[in-house]
Amino acid sequence: MNDKDTFRMHTKVIQIGDRKIGGGNPIAIQSMTNTKTEDVKATVEQILRLERAGCEIIRCTVPTLEAAAAIREIKKQIHIPLVADIHFDYRMALAAIENGADKIRINPGNIGNPERVKAVVDAAKERNIPIRVGVNSGSLEKPLVEKYGGVTAEGIVESALDKVHMIEDLGYDNLVISIKSSDVLMCVKAHELLAGRTVYPLHVGITESGTVNSGNIKSAIGLSLILSQGIGDTIRVSLTGDPVEEIKSAKLILRTLGLRKGGIEVVSCPTCGRTQINLIDLATKVEKMVEDYPLDIKVAVMGCVVNGPAEAKEADLGVAGGIGEGLLIKHGEIVKKLPEDQLLPALKEELDHWS
């Protein structure tokens, strides 16, 4: 599958800093810092690491006026749009906007009375920065829980649209919507319902998905079910761990679905009793080695000479192990036989001179 084959629902184009989302623009990968935003040095260092990994939009929490003030200095040192995450106190939103946030994320239902919501909307309107309207299943309003007999996809969607209409009634439509749940199937259903009822870009993610292991599985399932229907304009893989891992996972999900090109795909056999080299170690090292290559190719790491050579030939580049040695295979042809300890350097040399 390639980009031309991949169906995308049409949504409104929204500008976030220098990045456009919606309207068929590439799906943007987001993450969120886990530093104290007031700590400018630590926050900038983490954002720069995320940039190098492929993060395209970053969100920072703004719980204090000091955090809001830090946005101005942080933005001087980073290269991607910054979203201010606001909860409860509308003054944090006003301060974040004043200090140059490229977008703000709010739940209009938890930042106070209508006058406070209007103050935030007016400030965003003055600078023409988007507002992301965020609703999570865990904070669904009691009347909607009672109306639908519990927390449901229908309730989540109604809550989100109520908030959107609140802002539209104030004369502003520079909006992005996010609806999240840790329940994968509920989250999928909610996105299906919402996508048919709005033209605003959707930020997609499975919230509180868990650690790197469990969170990756839940996010891959949920995001794939949503994205494969053409729904979604930005994504985040929410993990309990280093945010850089979120970017790696998001890139792999998009590439697997044919929604993004670039980056080397590593395939390897699951090992069996025929494996004749230390394949687990080799495959792990290959996967780490290729992270920063922009090449759009497939590399195979196979463990034995029974099926290895034939399977490696389906890749652009590969190795197939023997007893303490292995074959280097390129474009389906065996290039050379090498000792096991030379396979990784040989792969790297081929990648460095790839054409």
Language-model-detected regions and their locations in the chain:
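Alpha-helix-loop-beta-strand connector modules within alpha/beta enzyme cores
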Residues: 65-86, 119-131, 191-202, 286-288
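Hydrophobic or amphipathic alpha-helical targeting/insertion segments
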Residues: 91-132
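Active-site mouth loops of central-metabolism enzymes
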Residues: 24-42, 61, 80-88, 144-157, ...
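Glycine-rich, proline-tolerant flexible connector loops at the mouths of alpha/beta enzymes
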Residues: 34, 39-40, 51-74, 105-113, ...
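Catalytic alpha/beta core domains of metabolic enzymes, predominantly
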Residues: 136, 144-291
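Hydrophobic faces of well-ordered beta-strands that scaffold small-molecule active sites
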Residues: 27-33, 58-60, 82-86, 104-106, ...
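Glycine-enriched alpha-helix->loop->beta-strand junction motifs that scaffold or abut catalytic
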Residues: 78-80, 98-104, 125-128, 195-201, ...
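N-terminal amphipathic alpha-helix/helix-capping segment at the start of soluble metabolic enzymes
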Residues: 1-32, 125, 288
